[in-house]
Amino acid sequence: MAKSPPRSGSRRPGRIGSRKSGRRIPKGVIHVQASFNNTIVTVTDVRGRVISWSSAGTCGFRGTRRGTPFAAQTAAGNAIRAVADQGMQRAEVMIKGPGLGRDAALRAIRRSGILLNFVRDVTPMPHNGCRPPKKRRV
């Protein structure tokens, strides 16, 4: 069966420019998710809408290098550079996960010049929930 031709006007016209860059954000929340394989840094406003994000993978690190502290530092610097231009002065930091990039990302955030209200560890800890997987035998 042949495809029908696309209808004109069925899609909305594309937005020119970014609507996120027009806002002034004086205060925000910086979420750092540090796993053993990667570190993801997300900057949101206080209502939780994403303003900027970066990860070690998007910064050009591949394979095992994504889990390194230097990769986390680079990812945090990239995410914060975008929001510093939008006027963010204060932030809260939420750190999640056991990865190596936790401290390096926090160091990069402190060096950026944004005042930190508090730093909170929000790593999920089970209250003896699900049974963990069996131990590996190598």
UniProtKB/Swiss-Prot annotation:
Tell me the compartments it is located in. Plastid, Chloroplast
Q: Where in the sequence does UniProt note compositional bias of the Basic residues kind? A: 9-24
Keywords carried by this UniProt record: Chloroplast, Plastid, Ribonucleoprotein, Ribosomal protein, RNA-binding, rRNA-binding
Q: Where is this region: Disordered?
A: 1-24
Q: Name one Pfam family in it.
A: Ribosomal_S11
Main localization of the protein?
Answer: plastid
Q: Which InterPro entries match?
A: Ribosomal_uS11 (IPR001971), Ribosomal_uS11_bac-type (IPR019981), Ribosomal_uS11_CS (IPR018102), Ribosomal_uS11_sf (IPR036967)
Query: Can you provide one Gene Ontology molecular function annotated for this UniProt record?
Result: structural constituent of ribosome
Q: Which GO terms describe its cellular component?
A: chloroplast; ribonucleoprotein complex; ribosome
Q: Name one GO biological process term.
A: translation
Q: Which domain of life is it from?
A: Eukaryota
Can you state the subunit structure given in the record?
Part of the 30S ribosomal subunit.
Name under which the protein is recorded = Small ribosomal subunit protein uS11c
The gene name on file is rps11
